[in-house]
Amino acid sequence: VTTTTVRQVIETPRRPDRTAPRETRLRALDGLRLVAALMVAAYHYGGRGGEVTTAWGSSPKDQFPTLSGYFAYGCLGVQVFFVISGFVICMSGWGRPLKSFFASRASRLLPAYWVAVVLVTAVFALPMVAFKAVAPSDALVNMTMLQQPLGVDRVLGVCWTLWAEVRFYALFALCVVLPGASRRRVIMFCAGWTLAAAIAQASREPLLDIVLMPEYASFFIGGVGLYLVHRDRRDVYAWGIVAVSFLIGQHYAVRSLWNAADPNAFAHRTTLGIVLVVAFGFLAVTAIALGWLNWANWRWLTVAGALTYPFYLVHEHLGWVVIHGLHIGLGLPSAETFALTVTSMLLLAWLMNRYVEKPLTPKLRSALAKAR
Protein backbone atom coordinates (compact mmCIF):
# COMPACT_ATOMS: atom_id res chain seq x y z
CA VAL A 1 0.00 0.00 0.00
CA THR A 2 1.43 3.32 -1.00
CA THR A 3 0.45 6.19 1.18
CA THR A 4 0.57 9.71 -0.01
CA THR A 5 1.21 12.39 2.51
CA VAL A 6 -0.79 15.46 1.69
CA ARG A 7 0.71 18.59 3.07
CA GLN A 8 -1.61 21.50 3.47
CA VAL A 9 0.03 24.73 2.51
CA ILE A 10 -1.69 27.73 3.95
CA GLU A 11 -1.32 30.70 1.68
CA THR A 12 -2.44 34.23 2.17
CA PRO A 13 -5.31 34.82 -0.24
CA ARG A 14 -4.19 37.09 -3.09
CA ARG A 15 -6.50 39.32 -5.03
CA PRO A 16 -6.40 38.62 -8.76
CA ASP A 17 -4.41 41.19 -10.74
CA ARG A 18 -7.37 42.14 -12.91
CA THR A 19 -9.53 43.07 -9.94
CA ALA A 20 -9.44 46.71 -9.00
CA PRO A 21 -8.60 47.21 -5.32
CA ARG A 22 -10.96 49.13 -3.12
CA GLU A 23 -9.46 52.61 -3.17
CA THR A 24 -9.96 55.23 -0.54
CA ARG A 25 -10.05 58.82 -1.73
CA LEU A 26 -6.51 60.20 -1.88
CA ARG A 27 -7.37 63.75 -0.88
CA ALA A 28 -3.73 64.82 -0.84
CA LEU A 29 -3.67 64.06 -4.57
CA ASP A 30 -6.57 66.48 -5.01
CA GLY A 31 -4.58 69.14 -3.19
CA LEU A 32 -1.51 68.48 -5.33
CA ARG A 33 -3.63 68.95 -8.44
CA LEU A 34 -4.56 72.45 -7.31
CA VAL A 35 -0.94 73.24 -6.42
CA ALA A 36 0.11 72.26 -9.96
CA ALA A 37 -2.68 74.39 -11.46
CA LEU A 38 -1.65 77.40 -9.38
CA MET A 39 1.95 76.91 -10.50
CA VAL A 40 0.83 77.10 -14.12
CA ALA A 41 -1.33 80.16 -13.37
CA ALA A 42 1.63 81.92 -11.75
CA TYR A 43 3.64 81.24 -14.90
CA HIS A 44 0.90 82.52 -17.21
CA TYR A 45 0.27 85.67 -15.16
CA GLY A 46 3.76 86.63 -14.08
CA GLY A 47 6.41 84.24 -15.38
CA ARG A 48 6.49 84.83 -19.13
CA GLY A 49 6.20 87.44 -21.84
CA GLY A 50 3.88 87.39 -24.84
CA GLU A 51 0.22 88.38 -24.78
CA VAL A 52 0.06 88.71 -21.01
CA THR A 53 2.21 91.83 -21.52
CA THR A 54 -0.82 93.42 -23.19
CA ALA A 55 -2.92 92.56 -20.15
CA TRP A 56 -0.50 94.20 -17.71
CA GLY A 57 0.46 97.07 -20.00
CA SER A 58 4.13 96.13 -19.60
CA SER A 59 6.27 93.07 -19.03
CA PRO A 60 5.41 90.98 -15.94
CA LYS A 61 9.08 91.46 -15.02
CA ASP A 62 8.23 95.09 -14.36
CA GLN A 63 5.16 94.13 -12.34
CA PHE A 64 6.93 91.45 -10.27
CA PRO A 65 10.66 92.24 -10.39
CA THR A 66 11.48 89.75 -7.62
CA LEU A 67 8.88 87.03 -8.10
CA SER A 68 8.82 86.80 -11.91
CA GLY A 69 11.98 84.70 -11.92
CA TYR A 70 10.32 82.17 -9.61
CA PHE A 71 7.02 82.33 -11.49
CA ALA A 72 8.94 81.26 -14.61
CA TYR A 73 9.32 77.78 -13.09
CA GLY A 74 5.54 77.46 -12.84
CA CYS A 75 5.35 76.01 -16.34
CA LEU A 76 6.67 72.78 -14.80
CA GLY A 77 3.30 72.38 -13.15
CA VAL A 78 2.35 70.68 -16.43
CA GLN A 79 4.93 67.95 -15.82
CA VAL A 80 3.58 67.52 -12.28
CA PHE A 81 0.10 67.14 -13.80
CA PHE A 82 1.39 64.42 -16.12
CA VAL A 83 2.83 62.42 -13.21
CA ILE A 84 -0.50 62.73 -11.38
CA SER A 85 -2.33 61.70 -14.55
CA GLY A 86 -0.24 58.55 -14.94
CA PHE A 87 -1.10 57.54 -11.38
CA VAL A 88 -4.81 58.33 -11.69
CA ILE A 89 -5.33 56.73 -15.11
CA CYS A 90 -3.68 53.50 -14.03
CA MET A 91 -5.84 53.48 -10.90
CA SER A 92 -9.07 54.22 -12.76
CA GLY A 93 -8.35 51.80 -15.61
CA TRP A 94 -7.47 48.83 -13.41
CA GLY A 95 -10.20 46.18 -13.56
CA ARG A 96 -12.39 48.25 -15.88
CA PRO A 97 -13.69 47.27 -19.33
CA LEU A 98 -12.72 49.51 -22.22
CA LYS A 99 -16.19 51.03 -22.66
CA SER A 100 -16.36 52.02 -18.99
CA PHE A 101 -12.86 53.50 -19.14
CA PHE A 102 -13.71 55.54 -22.24
CA ALA A 103 -17.00 56.74 -20.73
CA SER A 104 -15.22 57.80 -17.55
CA ARG A 105 -12.50 59.77 -19.33
CA ALA A 106 -14.77 61.42 -21.92
CA SER A 107 -17.36 62.47 -19.34
CA ARG A 108 -14.62 63.85 -17.12
CA LEU A 109 -12.97 65.98 -19.81
CA LEU A 110 -15.62 67.13 -22.23
CA PRO A 111 -18.40 69.07 -20.41
CA ALA A 112 -16.13 71.66 -18.77
CA TYR A 113 -13.95 71.79 -21.89
CA TRP A 114 -16.88 72.59 -24.18
CA VAL A 115 -18.10 75.34 -21.86
CA ALA A 116 -14.58 76.80 -21.57
CA VAL A 117 -14.24 76.96 -25.37
CA VAL A 118 -17.61 78.72 -25.66
CA LEU A 119 -16.78 81.17 -22.85
CA VAL A 120 -13.38 82.18 -24.22
CA THR A 121 -14.74 82.49 -27.77
CA ALA A 122 -17.61 84.69 -26.56
CA VAL A 123 -15.47 86.92 -24.34
CA PHE A 124 -12.77 87.43 -26.97
CA ALA A 125 -15.49 88.46 -29.45
CA LEU A 126 -16.48 91.43 -27.27
CA PRO A 127 -15.36 94.75 -28.79
CA MET A 128 -13.85 96.05 -25.54
CA VAL A 129 -11.53 93.04 -25.16
CA ALA A 130 -7.96 93.78 -26.22
CA PHE A 131 -7.21 90.30 -27.55
CA LYS A 132 -7.73 88.77 -30.97
CA ALA A 133 -11.16 87.22 -31.55
CA VAL A 134 -11.38 83.52 -32.39
CA ALA A 135 -12.60 82.61 -35.88
CA PRO A 136 -15.96 80.76 -35.69
CA SER A 137 -14.68 77.84 -37.77
CA ASP A 138 -11.64 77.45 -35.51
CA ALA A 139 -13.85 77.54 -32.42
CA LEU A 140 -16.00 74.73 -33.83
CA VAL A 141 -12.97 72.54 -34.56
CA ASN A 142 -11.72 73.20 -31.02
CA MET A 143 -14.83 71.45 -29.69
CA THR A 144 -13.33 68.15 -30.94
CA MET A 145 -10.04 68.49 -28.98
CA LEU A 146 -8.25 67.70 -32.26
CA GLN A 147 -7.35 71.27 -33.20
CA GLN A 148 -3.62 70.80 -32.64
CA PRO A 149 -3.03 67.86 -35.01
CA LEU A 150 -5.36 69.54 -37.53
CA GLY A 151 -3.30 72.74 -37.46
CA VAL A 152 -6.16 74.93 -36.21
CA ASP A 153 -5.62 77.87 -33.85
CA ARG A 154 -6.27 76.95 -30.23
CA VAL A 155 -9.03 78.69 -28.30
CA LEU A 156 -7.55 77.63 -24.96
CA GLY A 157 -3.83 78.13 -24.59
CA VAL A 158 -3.50 75.14 -22.27
CA CYS A 159 -5.29 72.65 -24.52
CA TRP A 160 -2.00 71.41 -25.98
CA THR A 161 -1.60 69.48 -22.71
CA LEU A 162 -5.01 67.87 -23.25
CA TRP A 163 -3.80 66.60 -26.63
CA ALA A 164 -0.91 64.93 -24.78
CA GLU A 165 -3.36 63.48 -22.24
CA VAL A 166 -5.63 62.09 -24.97
CA ARG A 167 -2.69 60.32 -26.62
CA PHE A 168 -1.69 58.82 -23.27
CA TYR A 169 -5.26 57.63 -22.66
CA ALA A 170 -5.31 55.99 -26.09
CA LEU A 171 -2.00 54.19 -25.55
CA PHE A 172 -2.99 53.00 -22.09
CA ALA A 173 -6.43 51.91 -23.26
CA LEU A 174 -5.09 49.87 -26.19
CA CYS A 175 -2.14 48.31 -24.37
CA VAL A 176 -3.52 47.81 -20.84
CA VAL A 177 -7.27 48.37 -20.46
CA LEU A 178 -8.41 46.47 -23.58
CA PRO A 179 -6.52 43.23 -22.80
CA GLY A 180 -7.11 43.66 -19.04
CA ALA A 181 -4.87 45.36 -16.51
CA SER A 182 -2.38 43.27 -14.57
CA ARG A 183 0.91 44.05 -12.88
CA ARG A 184 2.87 42.21 -15.55
CA ARG A 185 1.05 43.96 -18.40
CA VAL A 186 1.49 47.40 -16.84
CA ILE A 187 5.21 46.79 -16.32
CA MET A 188 5.58 45.69 -19.95
CA PHE A 189 3.64 48.77 -21.06
CA CYS A 190 5.95 51.08 -19.11
CA ALA A 191 9.11 49.36 -20.31
CA GLY A 192 7.93 49.18 -23.90
CA TRP A 193 6.84 52.81 -24.04
CA THR A 194 10.08 54.00 -22.45
CA LEU A 195 12.17 52.13 -25.03
CA ALA A 196 9.92 53.11 -27.93
CA ALA A 197 10.01 56.78 -26.90
CA ALA A 198 13.82 56.68 -26.82
CA ILE A 199 13.85 55.14 -30.30
CA ALA A 200 11.41 57.80 -31.51
CA GLN A 201 13.72 60.50 -30.19
CA ALA A 202 16.72 58.96 -31.93
CA SER A 203 14.90 58.40 -35.22
CA ARG A 204 13.53 61.95 -35.44
CA GLU A 205 10.50 60.53 -37.22
CA PRO A 206 7.59 63.00 -36.84
CA LEU A 207 4.90 60.30 -36.73
CA LEU A 208 6.66 58.42 -33.93
CA ASP A 209 7.14 61.67 -32.07
CA ILE A 210 3.41 62.42 -32.27
CA VAL A 211 2.35 58.95 -31.12
CA LEU A 212 5.00 58.24 -28.48
CA MET A 213 5.63 61.77 -27.10
CA PRO A 214 9.26 61.23 -26.01
CA GLU A 215 9.38 64.64 -24.29
CA TYR A 216 6.47 63.85 -21.95
CA ALA A 217 6.20 60.03 -21.90
CA SER A 218 8.45 59.61 -18.87
CA PHE A 219 6.16 61.73 -16.68
CA PHE A 220 3.09 59.65 -17.51
CA ILE A 221 5.10 56.44 -17.13
CA GLY A 222 6.49 57.62 -13.80
CA GLY A 223 2.96 58.18 -12.52
CA VAL A 224 1.92 54.70 -13.67
CA GLY A 225 4.93 53.25 -11.86
CA LEU A 226 3.95 55.11 -8.71
CA TYR A 227 0.52 53.52 -8.82
CA LEU A 228 2.25 50.13 -8.83
CA VAL A 229 4.19 51.35 -5.79
CA HIS A 230 0.87 52.33 -4.21
CA ARG A 231 -0.37 48.76 -4.71
CA ASP A 232 2.84 47.20 -3.39
CA ARG A 233 5.60 49.37 -1.95
CA ARG A 234 8.03 46.43 -2.11
CA ASP A 235 7.69 46.10 -5.90
CA VAL A 236 11.27 46.55 -7.13
CA TYR A 237 10.20 46.75 -10.77
CA ALA A 238 7.81 49.58 -9.95
CA TRP A 239 10.53 51.53 -8.18
CA GLY A 240 12.80 50.95 -11.17
CA ILE A 241 10.14 52.38 -13.50
CA VAL A 242 9.82 55.47 -11.29
CA ALA A 243 13.59 56.00 -11.06
CA VAL A 244 14.20 55.66 -14.81
CA SER A 245 11.23 57.93 -15.55
CA PHE A 246 12.54 60.65 -13.25
CA LEU A 247 16.02 60.50 -14.78
CA ILE A 248 14.68 60.76 -18.31
CA GLY A 249 12.01 63.31 -17.40
CA GLN A 250 14.42 65.76 -15.80
CA HIS A 251 16.60 65.52 -18.91
CA TYR A 252 13.77 66.55 -21.21
CA ALA A 253 12.64 69.29 -18.83
CA VAL A 254 16.12 70.79 -18.66
CA ARG A 255 16.62 70.48 -22.40
CA SER A 256 13.37 72.29 -23.24
CA LEU A 257 13.24 74.90 -20.45
CA TRP A 258 16.82 75.79 -19.52
CA ASN A 259 18.20 78.98 -20.97
CA ALA A 260 21.49 80.72 -20.42
CA ALA A 261 21.64 83.92 -18.41
CA ASP A 262 20.73 86.56 -20.98
CA PRO A 263 19.54 90.10 -20.27
CA ASN A 264 17.20 89.83 -23.27
CA ALA A 265 15.53 86.65 -21.98
CA PHE A 266 12.46 86.96 -19.77
CA ALA A 267 13.94 84.78 -17.04
CA HIS A 268 16.93 82.53 -16.45
CA ARG A 269 15.86 79.05 -15.39
CA THR A 270 18.78 77.15 -13.88
CA THR A 271 19.37 73.45 -14.36
CA LEU A 272 19.20 72.92 -10.60
CA GLY A 273 15.92 74.80 -10.32
CA ILE A 274 14.29 72.76 -13.09
CA VAL A 275 15.50 69.45 -11.65
CA LEU A 276 14.26 70.41 -8.18
CA VAL A 277 10.76 71.22 -9.44
CA VAL A 278 10.59 67.94 -11.37
CA ALA A 279 11.82 66.13 -8.26
CA PHE A 280 9.12 67.86 -6.22
CA GLY A 281 6.45 66.45 -8.54
CA PHE A 282 7.78 62.90 -8.33
CA LEU A 283 8.41 63.06 -4.57
CA ALA A 284 4.98 64.52 -3.82
CA VAL A 285 3.19 61.75 -5.72
CA THR A 286 5.54 59.19 -4.12
CA ALA A 287 4.58 60.42 -0.65
CA ILE A 288 0.91 60.07 -1.58
CA ALA A 289 1.46 56.61 -3.09
CA LEU A 290 3.16 55.41 0.10
CA GLY A 291 0.38 56.76 2.29
CA TRP A 292 2.59 59.30 4.04
CA LEU A 293 0.04 62.04 3.41
CA ASN A 294 -3.07 60.10 4.38
CA TRP A 295 -3.38 62.41 7.38
CA ALA A 296 -4.29 65.21 4.93
CA ASN A 297 -7.88 64.01 4.74
CA TRP A 298 -9.76 67.30 4.83
CA ARG A 299 -12.93 67.59 2.76
CA TRP A 300 -11.90 70.92 1.30
CA LEU A 301 -9.09 69.15 -0.56
CA THR A 302 -11.72 67.22 -2.52
CA VAL A 303 -13.34 70.55 -3.41
CA ALA A 304 -9.92 71.87 -4.45
CA GLY A 305 -9.41 68.87 -6.69
CA ALA A 306 -12.83 69.37 -8.28
CA LEU A 307 -12.01 73.00 -9.12
CA THR A 308 -8.63 72.22 -10.65
CA TYR A 309 -9.70 71.13 -14.14
CA PRO A 310 -12.14 73.98 -14.91
CA PHE A 311 -9.70 76.46 -13.35
CA TYR A 312 -6.91 75.12 -15.53
CA LEU A 313 -9.04 75.47 -18.66
CA VAL A 314 -10.16 79.08 -18.19
CA HIS A 315 -7.45 80.73 -16.12
CA GLU A 316 -5.06 81.77 -18.90
CA HIS A 317 -7.07 83.62 -21.54
CA LEU A 318 -9.92 84.79 -19.33
CA GLY A 319 -7.33 85.70 -16.71
CA TRP A 320 -5.70 88.08 -19.18
CA VAL A 321 -9.04 89.85 -19.61
CA VAL A 322 -9.49 90.18 -15.84
CA ILE A 323 -5.92 91.42 -15.37
CA HIS A 324 -6.40 94.06 -18.04
CA GLY A 325 -9.68 95.20 -16.51
CA LEU A 326 -8.37 95.39 -12.95
CA HIS A 327 -4.87 96.73 -13.58
CA ILE A 328 -5.35 98.97 -16.63
CA GLY A 329 -9.06 99.70 -16.27
CA LEU A 330 -9.33 100.19 -12.50
CA GLY A 331 -5.70 100.96 -11.74
CA LEU A 332 -5.29 98.30 -9.04
CA PRO A 333 -1.71 97.44 -7.99
CA SER A 334 -0.07 94.34 -9.43
CA ALA A 335 -0.25 92.19 -6.28
CA GLU A 336 -3.95 92.88 -5.71
CA THR A 337 -4.68 92.31 -9.40
CA PHE A 338 -2.85 88.97 -9.32
CA ALA A 339 -4.71 87.79 -6.20
CA LEU A 340 -8.12 88.94 -7.43
CA THR A 341 -7.57 87.34 -10.83
CA VAL A 342 -6.74 83.97 -9.28
CA THR A 343 -9.73 84.29 -6.94
CA SER A 344 -12.10 85.19 -9.77
CA MET A 345 -10.90 82.25 -11.87
CA LEU A 346 -11.40 79.90 -8.91
CA LEU A 347 -14.92 81.28 -8.49
CA LEU A 348 -15.64 80.71 -12.18
CA ALA A 349 -14.23 77.19 -11.82
CA TRP A 350 -16.60 76.57 -8.90
CA LEU A 351 -19.56 77.73 -11.00
CA MET A 352 -18.51 75.46 -13.86
CA ASN A 353 -18.12 72.51 -11.52
CA ARG A 354 -21.45 73.18 -9.80
CA TYR A 355 -23.60 73.91 -12.84
CA VAL A 356 -21.80 72.08 -15.66
CA GLU A 357 -19.72 69.17 -14.42
CA LYS A 358 -21.92 67.90 -11.59
CA PRO A 359 -25.12 67.63 -13.67
CA LEU A 360 -23.60 66.71 -17.05
CA THR A 361 -20.72 64.38 -16.18
CA PRO A 362 -22.84 61.53 -14.76
CA LYS A 363 -25.38 61.86 -17.57
CA LEU A 364 -22.72 61.71 -20.27
CA ARG A 365 -20.94 58.83 -18.52
CA SER A 366 -24.18 56.86 -18.29
CA ALA A 367 -25.07 57.52 -21.93
CA LEU A 368 -21.64 56.44 -23.18
CA ALA A 369 -21.52 53.38 -20.94
CA LYS A 370 -24.94 52.18 -22.16
CA ALA A 371 -24.31 52.82 -25.85
CA ARG A 372 -23.63 49.76 -28.00
Where are these regions (language model features)?
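Residues within membrane-spanning alpha-helices of integral membrane proteins
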Residues: 30, 34-37, 78, 85, ...
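Hydrophobic alpha-helical membrane-insertion segments
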Residues: 32-44, 110-126, 291, 295, ...
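Membrane-interface helix-loop-helix regions
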Residues: 48-76, 98, 103, 108-170, ...
